[in-house]
């Protein structure tokens, strides 16, 4: 979802669907309305300051209307599996210095050139097993990633054993080798983490990274010792923060133009989105066109968001009410 000043968007938080205007009593109540001939559609909703109405949409000018489920807006945390390259050596080569580098991009700034590097290091000894190697490398990486100035880790590190392939064993800077009791660890998982978010100030961010390998010497040749593979994500970050930021952004077109400047001498804006919830989204994209020199299409979007209970109940009810009132055939979720 792109939040841009180049697109005219009206946002309405639909907390409760109502049957008529008289039933609008609580902030977030909403009712879709149309004329008898079903040529125009508009919404009335209860804002924190009273009843408001949307644009009146000429139904012939609707370009599209599409619902997006909450899971489509959720962010899947990227996971890499790091293993020894069996084509080089499936077991650690004694005497070699194994170095794993994590290259973080867009760190602090948004440029790909804003890079930050962290390392894990293991010196292979005679008789070291692959399982022992993975333990040492995971612990080394976790300790080197520790930063007292960062409240949130840049990545999460896990070990996976052959006997429990679906179980993540977390490794932190406090983990000791004696805490890791399995003898069949066969990969290290490095997972993206959700970074701190502050409404309207710090967007929901994730720091992209790439595992990189330095070379070791095997049979007289310099070889990259490992393989990093992107694997199926197991964790997601829901869209609550994204929708909350969208509401904050859209409020800038409804009088909240100073964004808290002059605090504490300000009028606080009441927001309806719960950042801890998950939301389905409905976009109705349409245009206005006038006569004479105003015949060009002026495109707009009305966006309605509703809490997803896991079955899209609220959004599907809202879509049904819109279809009934207007004659549109918006697909439900």
Swiss-Prot record:
Any one of the GO CC terms: viral capsid, decoration
Major subcellular location class: virion
Domain of life: Viruses
Keyword Protein biosynthesis: no
UniProt keyword annotations, A-Z: Capsid decoration protein, Capsid protein, Virion
Keyword Hydrolase among UniProt keywords: no
Region (FD): 75-237
Subcellular compartments: Virion
Subunit structure: Interacts (via FD region) with the major capsid protein.
Biological role: Auxiliary capsid protein that forms an outer layer on the major capsid protein protrusions.
Protein name (database record): Auxiliary capsid protein
Species of origin: Bacteroides phage crAss001
């Amino acid at each position: 979802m792109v939040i841009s000043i180049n697109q005219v968007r009206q946002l309405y938080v639909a907390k409760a669907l109502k049957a008529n205007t008289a039933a609008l009593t609580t902030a977030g109540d909403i009712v879709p309305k149309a004329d008898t001939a079903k040529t125009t559609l508009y919404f009335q909703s209860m804002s924190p300051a009273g009843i408001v109405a949307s644009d009146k949409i000429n139904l012939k000018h609707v370009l599209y209307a599409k619902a997006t489920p909450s899971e489509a807006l959720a962010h899947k945390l990227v996971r890499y599996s790091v293993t020894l390259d069996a084509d080089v050596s499936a077991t650690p080569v004694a005497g070699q210095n194994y170095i794993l580098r994590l290259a973080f991009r867009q760190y602090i700034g948004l440029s790909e050139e804003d890079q930050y590097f962290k390392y894990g290091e293991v010196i292979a000894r005679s008789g070291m097993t692959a399982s022992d190697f993975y333990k040492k490398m995971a612990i080394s990486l976790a300790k080197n990633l520790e930063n007292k100035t960062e409240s949130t880790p840049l990545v999460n590190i896990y070990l996976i054993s052959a006997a429990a392939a679906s179980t993540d064993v977390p490794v932190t800077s406090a983990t000791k080798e004696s805490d890791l009791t399995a003898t069949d660890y066969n990969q290290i998982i490095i997972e993206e983490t959700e970074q701190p978010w502050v409404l309207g100030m710090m967007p929901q961010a994730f720091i992209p990274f790439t595992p990189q390998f330095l070379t070791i010497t095997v049979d007289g040749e310099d070889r990259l010792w490992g393989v990093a593979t992107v694997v199926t994500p197991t964790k997601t970050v829901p869209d609550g923060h994204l929708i909350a930021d969208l509401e904050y952004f859209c409020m800038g077109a409804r009088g909240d133009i100073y964004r808290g400047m002059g605090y504490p001498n300000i009028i606080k804006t009441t927001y309806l989105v719960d950042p801890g919830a998950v939301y389905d989204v409905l976009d109705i994209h349409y245009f206005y066109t006038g006569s004479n020199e105003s015949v060009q299409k002026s495109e707009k979007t009305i966006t309605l968001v509703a809490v997803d209970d896991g079955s899209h109940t609220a959004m599907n009810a809202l879509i049904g009410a819109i279809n009934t009132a207007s004659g549109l055939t918006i697909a439900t979720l």
